[in-house]
């Protein structure tokens, strides 16, 4: 494990021409203090956890005293926001410091979120508030523990500096990590802005640094598109399986690596509602839970359109190649999602006919507003007479559930497994704990009073979502009535 000064930064993105980024310096961040620190993320870059206690740590990761090799840049990109194309966006409050390369050869790009205004701030203050940084910090680590590809969070650094949103809040900086923060919108900017050479340069950069195995393909840019489609299908299937709604799936919030990125007004399902809208600014439900696969395809189509000049010199031929790649998305998503849901039901192998079993169950759950996480966690014990009454009681029509359960028993019978083995497998994929909005809100309320203990407690809990952790049982309870009044939006 390294000392802070031994971390060796490079910034490969900064080596690209000025058209790709700006070079602002981090704004002053008065009297900073540490709010939270993630030892698991620190281990990814070989940073010794004791280093987080040093003043130099806070100074380095608020951008005040750079470490060797740090070269801050803010990325430029465009994006479709709620379906409307915005030709220039960019990092309005974020700076990529550079990458740390591990002895194993992995590279982690470190980014400050909330570091102050940049050329892309569009008149905003370039700050993030404590509330939103806590939500992103906890969510990224919760999603990682659930097996969902995601950016990671190293630390939150706070300040008493006031930030003006719907109310006066305090400033914070989130240090987040990913192999890359390049987005679909990065390609859209150069494609629609009329910069074909820059578009090719960006694609070559992404292939060289993140998909080197594609470089020798006969059609490397088509292979890039196909790979991103496949990764995105896998990502969205995992969102749907764990009951996660992102809330703002603009193309500038879509990772070229298939990671969950830019946690804003997200939410995990409480009661199973297919049309769940977690973002109260999403008045038409464009980004509702059940719309996420469709929107992912739409966003991929935007990426494909941006890449058309690279797919074939003849536009019509390029369109056909893109369509063929996009046509595979639905099958890739369905295959992954069905396998994940089959595992949640304890099936060793998912068959085509199992889709009906899955969809019937979800229909029953929707009709009775059954808690998504708690039900699947409990379902593994349906064979136990002590558990079955509570399972039945969750449904408004217990007889309909009985009919489904009979078919489910018969399906399990074909596999001939012992109940204990099946239960163990189900407990390993059906979490007991997820980051419900009210849990995050309780941690935020304490943190705003300078008590960060609940942030740490939730972090430790969510690192082990599949473990019983009996001392934390209260965190697996149904949400309280007041939780329904929590509204989250893009304000951060």
Swiss-Prot record:
- The protein, known as: Protein nucleotidyltransferase YdiU
The residues annotated as the active site are: 252 (proton acceptor)
Q: Which UniProt keywords apply?
A: ATP-binding, Magnesium, Manganese, Metal-binding, Nucleotide-binding, Nucleotidyltransferase, Transferase
User: What residues does Mg(2+) bind to?
Assistant: 253, 262
The family classification in the record reads: Belongs to the SELO family.
Q: For this protein, what reaction is catalysed?
A: L-seryl-[protein] + ATP = 3-O-(5'-adenylyl)-L-seryl-[protein] + diphosphate; L-threonyl-[protein] + ATP = 3-O-(5'-adenylyl)-L-threonyl-[protein] + diphosphate; L-tyrosyl-[protein] + ATP = O-(5'-adenylyl)-L-tyrosyl-[protein] + diphosphate; L-histidyl-[protein] + UTP = N(tele)-(5'-uridylyl)-L-histidyl-[protein] + diphosphate
Q: What PANTHER family does its record include?
A: PROTEIN ADENYLYLTRANSFERASE SELO, MITOCHONDRIAL (PTHR32057:SF14)
The EC number of this protein is 2.7.7.-, 2.7.7.108
Q: What does this protein do?
A: Nucleotidyltransferase involved in the post-translational modification of proteins. It can catalyze the addition of adenosine monophosphate (AMP) or uridine monophosphate (UMP) to a protein, resulting in modifications known as AMPylation and UMPylation.
- Please name the source species: Thioalkalivibrio sulfidiphilus (strain HL-EbGR7)
First-level EC class: transferase
Concerning NCBIfam families, the annotation shows: PRK00029.1
Tell me which residues bind ATP: 90, 92-93, 113, 125-126, 176, 183, 262
Q: Which cofactor does it need?
A: Mg(2+); Mn(2+)
Record-level Gene Ontology MF annotations: AMPylase activity; ATP binding; magnesium ion binding
């Amino acid at each position: 494990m390294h000392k802070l000064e031994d971390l060796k930064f490079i910034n490969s993105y900064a080596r690209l021409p000025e058209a790709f980024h700006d070079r602002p310096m981090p704004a002053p961040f008065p009297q900073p203090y540490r709010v939270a620190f993630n030892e698991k993320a620190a281990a990814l870059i070989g940073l010794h956890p004791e280093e987080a206690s040093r003043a130099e740590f806070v100074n380095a990761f608020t951008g005040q005293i750079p470490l060797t090799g740090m070269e801050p840049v803010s990325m430029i990109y465009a994006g479709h926001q709620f379906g409307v194309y915005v030709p220039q966006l960019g990092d309005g409050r974020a700076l990529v410091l550079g990458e740390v390369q591990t002895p194993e050869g992995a590279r982690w790009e470190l980014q400050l979120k909330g570091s102050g205004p940049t050329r892309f701030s569009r008149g905003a203050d370039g700050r993030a508030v404590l509330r939103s940084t806590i939500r992103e910090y906890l969510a990224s680590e919760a999603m990682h523990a659930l097996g969902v590809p995601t950016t990671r969070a190293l630390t939150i650094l706070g300040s008493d500096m006031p930030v003006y949103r719907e109310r006066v809040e305090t400033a914070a900086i989130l240090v987040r990590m990913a192999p890359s923060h390049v987005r679909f919108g990065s390609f859209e900017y150069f494609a629609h802005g009329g910069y074909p050479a820059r578009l090719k340069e960006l694609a070559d950069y992404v292939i060289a640094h993140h998909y080197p195995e594609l470089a020798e393909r006969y059609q490397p840019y088509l292979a890039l598109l196909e790979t991103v489609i496949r990764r995105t299908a896998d990502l969205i299937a995992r969102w749907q399986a764990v009951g996660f709604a992102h809330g703002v799936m603009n193309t500038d919030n879509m990772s070229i690596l298939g990671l969950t990125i830019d946690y804003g007004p997200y939410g995990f399902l409480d009661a199973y509602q297919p049309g769940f809208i977690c973002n109260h600014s999403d008045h038409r439900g464009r980004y509702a839970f059940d719309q996420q696969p469709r929107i992912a395809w739409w966003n991929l189509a935007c990426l494909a359109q941006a890449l058309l000049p690279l797919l074939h010199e003849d536009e019509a031929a390029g369109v056909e190649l893109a369509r063929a790649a996009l046509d595979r998305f639905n099958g890739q998503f369905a295959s992954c999602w069905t396998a994940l849901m089959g595992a949640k039901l304890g099936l060793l192998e998912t068959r085509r006919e199992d889709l009906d079993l899955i969809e019937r169950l979800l229909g029953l759950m929707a009709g009775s507003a059954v808690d998504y996480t708690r039900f699947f966690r409990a379902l593994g014990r349906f064979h136990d007479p002590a558990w079955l009454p509570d399972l039945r009681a969750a449904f408004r029509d217990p007889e309909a559930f009985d009919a489904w359960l009979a078919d489910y028993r018969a399906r399990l019978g074909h596999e001939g497994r012992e109940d204990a083995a099946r239960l163990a497998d189900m407990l390993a994929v059906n979490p007991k704990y997820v980051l419900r909005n009210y849990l995050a809100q309780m941690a935020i309320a304490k943190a705003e009073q300078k008590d960060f203990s609940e942030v740490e407690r939730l972090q430790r809990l969510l690192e082990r979502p599949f473990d019983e952790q009996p001392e934390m049982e209260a965190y697996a309870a149904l949400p309280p009535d007041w939780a329904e009044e929590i509204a989250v939006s893009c304000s951060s």
